[in-house]
């Protein structure tokens, strides 16, 4: 199937599965343990129904949304993804470029394979910087400084990785972070010569570029990745440390990985301008609820004191409209963007965003919503569900 014939995210996934080595595809696609959380993220959306309202003039539809004082063209953005470069060389900057062209947010992970400085140069108004706390407070402080020096508007602190999770697909495949060229990886790669050729031409397995500046001299090509592996996760991360980050950052602060309404309230009290409801795409706790399931309770808990964003399981335009009807301002998705890149490079990334924009537009017309301000609990069946 060519990229032009991919009609939805599942089609992109199918193409990517053929083109990527199994170890890489499983790293992107997989969840934790039995992957019940991964499945729940999708079934949660399927439990809701959108209620059409007809005889509404929907000849002109506007899916733009205001968030943190900026107007974005669509109610979705690109989730942060570490080691994204394994799917396609240079994909982090392709994502930044595509986000700028589509005018949607791009959340760059500090575990990415390009620097935040490079992303900010490509997409200065669309790049948000997502960081994990480390066990080295000097690096924590410097990551915030780098975002501040670049005049980025939004800093995202991910809090749902207190310890490493039990990703059994990765363990079975011999996947490591940072990636190592093991015999199993080498043999699997032989079945995907084009994937191998891309990395040979681009200089090899991608490094964690954001961390290179912190690596000791002489520590090797991906010394930053090795250092990252020793300093993360940070099980000692607390609300006090989040407040410390807030004190060093004057821009928008968003806390990612919130599921508890009480934690959402605490985040707002700590100075957060927004929270991202997320279970890390089903990659941390297999028994965790879907972010969509907790969305109504979180909105009730924090009211309008902060913005609510949501990721984990968003695959259709109808998913986005359901989330907005329940109180989210904007949704995020990640895996489909890497599947698009693996399927078609830069064109595949653009195609993924275009697919979602088209679906949102169609669903808005179908349910009688000419602009997103018109959607609410009345757009669901049963009403208020």
Predicted regions and their residues:
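An N-cap/entry alpha-helix motif that binds or orients negatively charged groups
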Residues: 1-70, 178-237, 373-375, 381-385
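A generic secondary-structure signal marking the coil-to-beta-strand transition
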Residues: 46, 68, 72-76, 125, ...
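Short, charged beta->alpha transition segments
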Residues: 60-69, 94, 107-119
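Glycine-rich active-site/cofactor-binding loop and its immediate structural neighborhood
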Residues: 72-111
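Alpha/beta enzyme core
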Residues: 83, 97, 122, 135-310, ...
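A gly/proline- and charged-residue-enriched helix-loop-helix capping module
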Residues: 100-122, 126-140
């Amino acid at each position: 199937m060519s990229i032009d014939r991919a009609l939805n995210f599942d089609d992109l996934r199918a193409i990517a599965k053929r083109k990527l080595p199994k170890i890489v595809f499983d790293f992107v696609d997989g969840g934790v343990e039995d992957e019940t959380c991964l499945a729940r993220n999708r079934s949660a959306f399927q439990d809701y129904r959108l209620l059409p309202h007809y005889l509404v003039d929907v000849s002109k539809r506007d899916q733009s949304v205001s968030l943190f004082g900026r107007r974005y063209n669509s109610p979705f953005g690109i989730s942060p993804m570490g080691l994204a470069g394994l799917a396609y060389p240079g994909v982090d900057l392709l994502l930044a470029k595509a986000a700028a062209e589509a005018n949607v947010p791009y959340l760059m992970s500090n575990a990415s394979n390009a620097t935040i400085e490079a992303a900010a140069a490509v997409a200065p108004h669309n790049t948000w910087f997502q960081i994990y706390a480390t066990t080295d407070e000097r690096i924590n402080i410097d990551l915030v400084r780098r975002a501040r020096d670049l005049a980025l508007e939004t800093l995202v602190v991910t809090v749902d990785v207190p310890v490493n999770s039990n990703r059994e697909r990765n363990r079975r495949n011999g996947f490591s972070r940072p990636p190592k060229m093991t015999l199993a990886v080498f043999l699997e790669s032989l079945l995907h010569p084009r994937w191998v050729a891309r990395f040979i031409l681009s200089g090899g397995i991608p490094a964690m570029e954001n961390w290179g500046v912190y690596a000791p001299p002489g520590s090797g090509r991906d010394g930053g990745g090795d250092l990252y592996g020793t300093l993360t996760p940070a099980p000692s991360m607390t609300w006090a440390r989040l407040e410390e980050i807030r004190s060093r950052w004057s821009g928008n602060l968003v806390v990612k990985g919130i599921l508890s309404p009480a934690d959402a309230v605490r985040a707002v009290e700590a100075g957060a301008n927004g929270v991202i409801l997320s279970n890390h795409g089903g990659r941390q706790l297999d028994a965790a609820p879907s972010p969509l399931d907790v969305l109504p309770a979180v909105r009730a808990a924090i009211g309008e004191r902060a913005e609510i964003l949501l990721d984990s399981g968003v695959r259709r335009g109808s998913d986005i409209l359901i989330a907005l009807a329940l109180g989210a301002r904007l949704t995020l998705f990640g895996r489909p963007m890497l599947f698009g890149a693996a399927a078609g490079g830069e064109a595949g990334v653009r195609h993924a965003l275009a697919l979602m924009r088209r679906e949102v537009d169609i669903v808005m017309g179908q349910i009688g919503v000419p602009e997103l301000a018109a959607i609410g609990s009345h757009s669901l069946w049963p009403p208020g569900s």
